[in-house]
């Protein structure tokens, strides 16, 4: 009897360890699974011809320049011309940070041209120019801004990053309804890319790097990284008129499901990954779903996405000081009011905090607690 009880307790403990490994604070199991993808990828495809991208109406070429070290993290926020309230909420919260953990951060907004037929914001071209002059954080390209043009918008942003912000170590692509925990994201990237001292020692040589033939000489290469909330074995939607529809011509059924890709609500690319994707993107099928397109291009380049459970993907997490301050790197579907409430909750408006974000017990439960809160309130 005692032996049977002991076996049951041992089995329960083993199951608990498995669950903790897969879903605990580190998300180690999911990350190991995503890392194993690299060995299954085909050999990298040969580079394609240069991408034919629309010209920039507001190029903002000097956004990453200036005194001091170059940006460690460049954040590109996909927005729409009419979403001024969302942009202002980001500027007044996490997007207003210029430094995190002692490293420079730069946030820019990506958008296209407003629809001239729209009854409310069809004539906002001059408003955007005024906003850009006042804020200095707008990148606008010459294409009609729409959901189906997100791929064009994202590629324009990545291409700008490679040309005008080549010294940035990492690029985060996100949307204007996403809260970003910038300090914790910077910490996460530093841990993945090496010791703090490695970056601190390399900023001075980079700042004074020589330029030969228009090419900036990097003193230290950043390892390839494509980090996000990974979607696995997603089949294309064929629903007529659907927002996420992908036609048979764009992705034939014989190709099967999409390769693994990171949710477009927030994924990080190292500078080397940005260069890789841009090199092979012209040979990838031009899909309207930008996150899928980036995943397909990454696969063609021999790069697999790495799972990060702290990046929320499409999940909306209710406001919680511990989750938003410590364990989450992003949270989706926040309106402008919620964005600023989240910022106040973590003490962002005060510039400092006097108490820990989490209790000891909350810290032990980690990301698992945040997931449970989201599930209970969904």
Curated annotation (Swiss-Prot):
Keyword check for Transferase: yes
Gene that this sequence comes from: B3GALT4
Keywords for the protein's UniProt record, in alphabetical order: Glycoprotein, Glycosyltransferase, Golgi apparatus, Lipid metabolism, Membrane, Signal-anchor, Transferase, Transmembrane, Transmembrane helix
Residues carrying a glycan: 149
Gene Ontology biological process: ganglioside biosynthetic process; glycosphingolipid biosynthetic process; oligosaccharide biosynthetic process; protein O-linked glycosylation
Bilayer-spanning residue ranges: 9-19
InterPro entries: Glyco_trans_31
Regions annotated as coiled coil: none
Lumenal side: 20-378
Cytoplasmic face residues: 1-8
Protein name per the record: Beta-1,3-galactosyltransferase 4
Lineage: Eukaryota, Metazoa, Chordata, Craniata, Vertebrata
Chief location category: Golgi
Locations listed in the record: Golgi apparatus membrane
Function statement: Involved in GM1/GD1B/GA1 ganglioside biosynthesis.
Annotated catalysed reactions: a ganglioside GM2 (d18:1(4E)) + UDP-alpha-D-galactose = a ganglioside GM1 (d18:1(4E)) + UDP + H(+); a ganglioside GM2 + UDP-alpha-D-galactose = a ganglioside GM1 + UDP + H(+); a ganglioside GD2 (d18:1(4E)) + UDP-alpha-D-galactose = a ganglioside GD1b (d18:1(4E)) + UDP + H(+); a ganglioside GA2 (d18:1(4E)) + UDP-alpha-D-galactose = a ganglioside GA1 (d18:1(4E)) + UDP + H(+)
Biological pathway: Protein modification; protein glycosylation
Presence of keyword ATP-binding: no
Protein topology in the membrane: Single-pass type II membrane protein
């Amino acid at each position: 009897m005692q032996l049977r009880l002991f076996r049951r307790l041992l089995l329960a403990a083993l199951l608990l360890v498995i669950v903790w490994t897969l879903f605990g604070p580190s998300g180690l199991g999911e990350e190991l699974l995503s890392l194993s993808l690299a060995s299954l990828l085909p050999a990298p495809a040969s580079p394609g011809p240069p991408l034919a991208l629309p010209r920039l109406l507001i190029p903002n070429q000097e956004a990453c320049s200036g005194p001091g070290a170059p940006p460690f993290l460049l954040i590109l926020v996909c927005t729409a011309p009419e979403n001024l309230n969302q942009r202002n909420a980001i500027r007044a919260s996490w997007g207003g940070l210029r430094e995190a953990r002692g490293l420079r951060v730069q946030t820019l907004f990506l958008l296209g041209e407003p629809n001239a037929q729209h009854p409310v914001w069809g004539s906002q071209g001059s408003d955007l120019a005024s906003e850009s002059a006042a804020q200095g954080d707008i990148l606008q390209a010459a294409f009609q801004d729409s959901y189906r043009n997100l791929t064009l918008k994202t590629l324009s942003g990545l291409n700008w990053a490679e040309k005008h912000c080549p010294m940035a170590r990492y690029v985060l692509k996100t949307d204007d309804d996403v809260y970003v925990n910038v300090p914790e994201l910077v910490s996460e990237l530093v841990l993945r890319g090496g010791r703090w001292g490695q970056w601190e020692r390399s900023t001075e040589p980079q700042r004074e790097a020589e330029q030969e033939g228009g090419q900036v000489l990097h003193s230290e290469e950043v390892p390839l990284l494509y980090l996000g909330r990974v979607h696995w074995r997603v089949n294309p939607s064929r629903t007529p008129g659907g927002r996420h529809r992908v036609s048979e011509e764009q992705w034939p059924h014989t190709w099967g499901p999409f390769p693994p890709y990171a949710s477009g609500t927030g994924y990080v690319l190292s500078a080397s990954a940005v260069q890789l994707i841009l090199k092979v993107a012209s040979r990838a099928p031009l899909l309207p779903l930008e996150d899928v397109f980036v995943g397909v291009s990454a696969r063609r380049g021999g790069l697999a996405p790495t799972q990060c459970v702290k990046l929320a993907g499409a999940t909306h997490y209710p406001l919680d000081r511990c989750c938003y301050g410590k364990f989450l790197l992003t949270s989706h579907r926040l309106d402008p009011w919620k964005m600023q409430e989240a910022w106040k909750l973590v003490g962002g408006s005060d510039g400092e905090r006097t108490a820990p974000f989490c209790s000891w017990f909350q810290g032990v439960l980690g990301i698992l607690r945040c997931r449970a809160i989201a599930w209970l309130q969904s």
